[in-house]
């Protein structure tokens, strides 16, 4: 049996180009990894992490479980295309073995097996199974066509605006499986066989189309099928569909603890090109839903970075609230990629940023517990006064790092991309904390909390947000609170909730003093207040617009007081509502017996 026909040529060329480009990209990216990352891969290979990564590939790259959580119909669409095509390949491979044994069959022989196997006795099991899988994939294609017409049916208000290369690949992919159906059915019409789908369509064709036109149709259909595959394969490495072959190594590398950092690295390529541009990140973005800004979302940031088209406006206009990352089905570390892109654009060390604090120490008090207010808390003095009262009520001796002013934690500069200047600030504060011998560091600012935990080297110092610290005091019996009838609603700050995973502690504190009413968007889905220090592009008026939309949802709970656990959120939400907005520490002080 000869496994070649002229129509195979587009497929063969396309597959050769695709695999050559994939090998070049993977090889280059892996080669350029730093030695430490290569060691992580080497030591991670013979561990359980490899098995965990393999399972994640099945559950996410094929079954798309994260997308199912967004919308079941959307999840089914992605699964039918990915898992269905995979099964067509796997079962098709088994089919050739069932017919021919383990003899060598070239790649095109497997792909176009129905064309080459016309003289063989048909096996009903494979005819039925392959038709069932083809129908499975075709159902996904139909849903993809429908999504283009009405995306809301799949829970998406907005879809991605694709570049021309993506449209070429998308068009080719959409026609691959309908073309396969017609080609295989035409062959069945001429030579018999086929399952419930191709066989039935083939019978219809043979009854309505003459032999010569049918032979011409068969040839044209196989050419079209092969050409669609060839075009798709050539376009794939340069389009959004590169994610098919990039998400898999990304999952393994992530399991081996490779991460994106403050500076761009070769590992970033795996993250950037693993983006499928599915558009799931668009709807959660408040810049889009509130302000109508629709060209800076993560999908466009990653696209522009990949093609070296990234503009300052796109890189800087992001709240970095994490709402999009929470929904990303590939789990790309979007904020880290933003930071190192900004670092590349903005990081020019400036002595004026940090020169002023050489030798500066305005701290006061003594004690093993230290309190770092942070810049934003200093702008909301009631929060710091409340913490002072709580420390006094608990009998805590406290060292105050910055009650009379001090040095910023450094995170705002880091988020702006000025990482070298930020590191100077971090070193100063870390030295100050160690100098005064504290063992616990409490802060009321989630921005400070996150940078202390992730970027500071503070061995032997426990770092707590004031919500965690207050709850500890309550449970230890060091604070006696009176539970009242006041109704509160709680706003989850981005850096505290999605950023640091602290959701339960603030709620437990609120429930110790009154009734908690949850807003519509809460916990992982909580809205950003709009005044993020990470966004240097939107105006003050636009920040207020976002704050009003957040406050409206909080007011809708019917609560008497809006509570938050971030000084920046407190100020922002306060500008968007006439309701009373308090910090968590303030309602605790009011309830102390």
Question: Where do the PLM segments sit?
Answer:
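Short coil/turn segments at secondary-structure boundaries
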Residues: 69-75, 288, 316, 353-354
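Aromatic-flanked redox-active Cys/Sec active sites in thiol-based oxidoreductases
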Residues: 272, 315, 403
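Sequence context surrounding c-type heme c attachment/ligation sites in exported
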Residues: 269-276
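Iron-sulfur cluster-binding cysteine motifs and their immediate structural context
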Residues: 243-246, 276, 280-306, 312-345, ...
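Short, charged low-complexity linear segments at domain edges
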Residues: 244-267, 290-308, 385, 503-512, ...
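Membrane-embedded alpha-helical bundles of multi-pass integral membrane proteins
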Residues: 1-266, 282, 345
């Amino acid at each position: 049996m000869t496994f070649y026909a002229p129509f195979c040529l587009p497929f063969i060329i396309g597959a050769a180009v695709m695999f050559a480009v994939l090998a070049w990209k993977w090889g280059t990216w892996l080669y350029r990894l730093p030695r430490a990352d290569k060691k992580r891969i080497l030591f991670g290979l013979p561990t359980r992490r490899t098995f965990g990564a393999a399972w994640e590939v099945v559950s996410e790259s094929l079954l798309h479980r994260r997308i199912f959580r967004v919308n079941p119909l959307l999840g089914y669409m992605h699964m039918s295309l990915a898992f269905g095509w995979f099964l067509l390949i796997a079962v098709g491979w088994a089919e050739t073995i069932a017919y021919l044994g383990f003899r060598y069959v070239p790649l095109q022989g497997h792909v176009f097996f129905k064309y080459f196997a016309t003289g063989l006795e048909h096996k009903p099991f494979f005819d039925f199974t392959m038709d069932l899988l083809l129908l499975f994939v075709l159902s996904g294609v139909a849903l993809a066509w429908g999504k283009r017409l009405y995306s809301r049916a799949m829970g998406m208000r907005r879809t991605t605006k694709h570049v021309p290369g993506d449209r070429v690949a998308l068009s080719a992919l959409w026609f691959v499986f309908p073309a396969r159906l017609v080609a295989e059915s035409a062959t069945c019409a001429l030579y018999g066989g086929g399952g419930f789908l191709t066989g039935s369509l083939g019978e219809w064709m043979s009854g309505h189309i003459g032999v010569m036109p049918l032979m011409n149709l068969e040839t044209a259909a196989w050419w079209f099928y092969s050409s669609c595959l060839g075009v798709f394969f050539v376009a794939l490495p340069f389009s959004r569909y590169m994610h098919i072959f990039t998400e898999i190594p990304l999952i393994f590398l992530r399991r081996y603890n490779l991460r994106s950092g403050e500076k761009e690295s070769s590992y970033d390529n795996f993250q950037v090109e693993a983006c499928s541009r599915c558009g799931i990140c668009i709807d959660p973005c408040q810049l889009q839903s509130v302000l109508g800004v629709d060209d800076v979302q993560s999908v466009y940031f990653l696209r522009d970075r990949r093609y070296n088209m990234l503009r300052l406006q796109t890189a800087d206009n992001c709240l970095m609230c994490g709402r999009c990352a929470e929904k990303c089905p590939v789990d790309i570390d979007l904020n880290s990629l933003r930071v190192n892109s900004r670092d590349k654009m903005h990081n020019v060390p400036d002595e004026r940023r940090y020169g002023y604090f050489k030798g500066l120490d305005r701290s006061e008090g003594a004690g093993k517990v230290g309190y770092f207010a942070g810049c934003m808390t200093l702008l909301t003095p009631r929060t710091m006064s409340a913490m002072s009262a709580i420390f006094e009520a608990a009998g805590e001796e406290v060292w105050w790092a910055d009650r009379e002013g001090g040095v910023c934690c450094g995170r705002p500069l880091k988020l702006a991309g000025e990482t070298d200047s930020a590191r100077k600030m971090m070193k100063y504060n870390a030295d100050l904390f160690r100098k005064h011998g504290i063992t616990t560091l409490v802060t009321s600012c989630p921005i400070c909390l996150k940078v202390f935990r992730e970027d500071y080297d503070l061995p032997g110092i426990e770092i707590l947000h004031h919500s965690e610290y207050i709850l500890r005091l309550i449970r230890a019996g060091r604070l006696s609170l009176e539970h009242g009838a006041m109704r509160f609603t709680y706003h989850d700050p981005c850096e505290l909730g999605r950023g640091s995973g602290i959701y339960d502690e603030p709620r437990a504190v609120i429930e110790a003093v009154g009734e908690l009413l949850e807003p519509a968007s809460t916990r992982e889905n909580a809205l950003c207040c709009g005044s993020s220090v990470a966004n240097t592009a939107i105006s003050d008026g636009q920040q207020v617009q976002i704050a009003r939309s957040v406050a409206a949802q909080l007011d809708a709970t019917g609560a008497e007081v809006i509570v938050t656990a971030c000084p920046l959120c407190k100020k922002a939400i306060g500008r968007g509502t006439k309701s009373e907005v308090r910090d968590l520490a303030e309602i605790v002080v009011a309830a102390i017996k």
